[in-house]
């Protein structure tokens, strides 16, 4: 934790950092650990579970439930969640997705936070690329049999059928929606979750 606190001291973070997480219980630990590092580095924090307490002030600025301006966040939320929101809006409208500065029901979306120009987000957008499992088949094709890689493909290939394989959603998290399949094509174990509609790697 000392190294993490040291990194925060040398960051461009503002004095107050909102720690954003969804309501998945597994994310509580990550949020609390980061909060401890931030406190050690001298920052004030507030953990936001979900988006329910966020809203806008009269000037259209994003605020938390205590009326504090939200302008610096560290998040456990996956960028993929924001992309899903963009896709959802894009399916209905042909214009660019607007970032809200108000809403009749005060409903704040994740994209209203993460894509606001004035909000400094710790976990930059480029982390989507190494964080997405779709890069694994590409790495395997570039570096086959590398000691730090497993045979991975976008389809079940002959080699995977021989050895058995795992089925994983490309942007899944927390061990959700994973199947373990034997070389006899029997499902040995599986987990449920909210990523069943995603494309898989094998």
Stretch-by-stretch model annotation:
Residues 1-202:
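Domain-scale recognition of functional cores that engage charged ligands
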């Amino acid at each position: 934790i000392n190294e993490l606190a040291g990194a925060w001291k040398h960051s461009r973070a503002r004095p107050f950092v909102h720690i954003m997480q969804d309501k998945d219980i597994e994310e509580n630990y990550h949020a609390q650990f980061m909060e401890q590092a931030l406190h050690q580095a001298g920052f004030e924090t507030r953990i936001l579970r979900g988006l329910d307490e966020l809203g806008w002030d009269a000037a259209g600025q994003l605020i938390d439930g205590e009326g504090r301006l939200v302008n610096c966040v560290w998040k456990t939320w996956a960028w993929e969640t924001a992309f899903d929101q963009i896709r959802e809006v894009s399916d209905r409208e042909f214009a660019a997705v607007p970032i809200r500065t108000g809403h009749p029901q005060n409903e704040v979306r994740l994209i209203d936070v993460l894509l606001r120009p004035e909000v400094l987000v710790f976990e930059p957008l480029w982390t989507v690329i190494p964080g997405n499992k779709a890069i694994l088949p590409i790495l395997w094709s570039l570096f086959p049999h590398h000691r730090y890689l497993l045979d991975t493909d976008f389809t079940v290939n002959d080699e995977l059928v021989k050895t058995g394989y795992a089925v994983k959603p490309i942007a899944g998290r927390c061990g959700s929606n994973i199947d373990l399949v034997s070389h006899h094509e029997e499902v040995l174990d599986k987990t449920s979750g909210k990523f069943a509609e995603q494309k898989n790697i094998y």
